[in-house]
């Protein structure tokens, strides 16, 4: 019995710590540095996520960042599923740990991204119908309004109802709520700009980032 308990605790520790360390990998920073685009923390909003990497003008690096940030959520969930034979509580903890790792990466003094790509990676690997529904929501909102943050916030709000509709286990529903709350907290500045009608459209720079107008000719 003691051996079984030790194995269970070890498995839990691997799922949580492993998920967090995976989530902490700053793909945006790695991609921009290796790709010659500089330090992403000094570009645009300073965020390490794919949306800000796109502001560097490098769509290839933004795509790499998106895949990497989503992929670490996928790997964390699949690892937990393999280790526990599909235990929904451990899977939710591993996915949540990867998500927290992206938001608060140990390698960057706990200053990370907003978690949207990792959120989708966790959803797709833990319950793919929910991930597809949330992704479709993002695409629809982005197409209609051309505002990335609004699309992400809408998808986050609807993730738990989607989980309920697809009859997912309670730990996964709790994970959806947990991630949605943190996504809203991390997007508080975006929400303030949305309320003022100042949130930039997809592909547009923030007003503060735009070059000042040229002076009139004498």
Curated annotation (Swiss-Prot):
This is Glycerol-3-phosphate acyltransferase. PANTHER family: GLYCEROL-3-PHOSPHATE ACYLTRANSFERASE-RELATED, INNER MEMBRANE PROTEIN YGIH. One of its GO terms (molecular function) is acyl-phosphate glycerol-3-phosphate acyltransferase activity. It is a multi-pass membrane protein. Catalyzes the transfer of an acyl group from acyl-phosphate (acyl-PO(4)) to glycerol-3-phosphate (G3P) to form lysophosphatidic acid (LPA). This enzyme utilizes acyl-phosphate as fatty acyl donor, but not acyl-CoA or acyl-ACP. GO terms for cellular component: plasma membrane. Pathway: Lipid metabolism; phospholipid metabolism. It catalyses: an acyl phosphate + sn-glycerol 3-phosphate = a 1-acyl-sn-glycero-3-phosphate + phosphate. Belongs to the PlsY family. One of its GO terms (biological process) is phospholipid biosynthetic process. The gene is plsY. Disulfide bonds: none annotated. It is found in: Cell inner membrane. The chain crosses the membrane at residues 10-30, 60-80, 88-108, 125-145, 165-185. The lineage of its organism: Bacteria, Pseudomonadati, Pseudomonadota, Alphaproteobacteria, Caulobacterales. Pfam families: G3P_acyltransf. Keywords: Cell inner membrane, Cell membrane, Lipid biosynthesis, Lipid metabolism, Membrane, Phospholipid biosynthesis, Phospholipid metabolism, Transferase, Transmembrane, Transmembrane helix. It is an enzyme of class 2 (transferase). Its main location: membrane. The keyword RNA-binding does not apply. Probably interacts with PlsX. Its EC number is 2.3.1.275.
């Amino acid at each position: 019995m003691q051996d079984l308990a030790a194995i269970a605790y070890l498995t839990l520790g691997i799922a949580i710590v492993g998920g967090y360390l995976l989530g902490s990998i700053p793909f945006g920073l790695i991609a921009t540095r290796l790709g010659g685009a500089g330090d992403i923390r000094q570009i645009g909003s300073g965020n390490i996520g794919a949306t800000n990497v796109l502001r560097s003008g490098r769509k290839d690096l933004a795509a790499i960042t998106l895949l990497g940030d989503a992929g670490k959520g996928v790997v964390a969930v699949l690892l937990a599923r393999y280790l526990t034979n599909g235990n929904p509580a451990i899977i939710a903890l591993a996915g949540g740990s990867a998500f927290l790792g992206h938001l608060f990466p140990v390698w960057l003094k706990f200053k990370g991204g907003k978690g949207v790509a990792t959120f989708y990676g966790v959803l797709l690997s833990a319950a793919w119908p929910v991930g597809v529904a949330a992704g479709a929501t993002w695409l629809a909102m982005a197409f209609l309004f051309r505002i990335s943050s609004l699309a992400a916030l809408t998808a986050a709000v609807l993730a738990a109802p989607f989980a309920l509709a697809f009859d997912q286990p309670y730990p996964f529903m709790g994970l959806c709520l947990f991630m949605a709350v943190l996504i809203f907290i991390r997007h508080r500045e975006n929400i303030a700009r949305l309320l003022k009608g100042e949130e930039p459209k997809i592909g547009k720079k923030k007003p503060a980032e735009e070059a000042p107008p040229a002076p009139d000719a004498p």
